């Protein structure tokens, strides 16, 4: 498990990014001024773009000046540039990584006591859902319910993340909401719990909102390709400070399988 303490530089970067996420979980956001904050990756595995209200955070080990140039070259609304298809395509080509989806990001405060839903923890690390989760998270724990699965683990910058999966035969019975609610009871240490949903997966979005998860923004993760994807966590070892790219904000406008799962 990554503690963010391998090098002083990596730890400092991770702490700043983690603090930004903690603030967002409490409803405190960076200035909505159209600017972009560029940070080094918190570890070799995690890279991507986090878009908040009129502010974006790009976490990559690529040259911040290159990021600035490519954002300025995007022919779109400047506020949309960090998550635009042209810019993400440039990031993928530059890093050799893959963006699977632009996810809707939500967060919820922890709840006291055990969950009401009956759950059985899966200890088998070779379980397919455990293997998948380990490609994106540390400290992974997985529980099974009748017709569904709940995953908890530490994801980007050490934040606790939940993911759920509901069998087709168990849909429309409130199980997704119950699993998402259970995550709020099971998250350790009184920390907020985050969840990513594909925007087109309306069932997942509704389930997490019904469980008390609040919208925060959108996120595109740059995932390593092939067997290197579940890379071990370590400090990125980069000690340069964050860069901010100011983009002009536009003037406000007047007046398959038969199941669903969260991302990843």
Question: What do the PLM-derived regions correspond to, one by one?
Answer:
Residues 1-22, 226-264:
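Actinobacteria-biased recognition of intrinsically disordered, low-complexity terminal regions
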Residues 1-100, 120-137:
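N-terminal charged segments
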Residues 56-57, 187-199:
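Conserved GNAT acetyl-CoA-binding A-motif
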Residues 135-150:
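Conserved beta-hairpin
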Residues 177, 199-217, 260, 264:
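Conserved active-site alpha-helix within GNAT-family acetyltransferase domains
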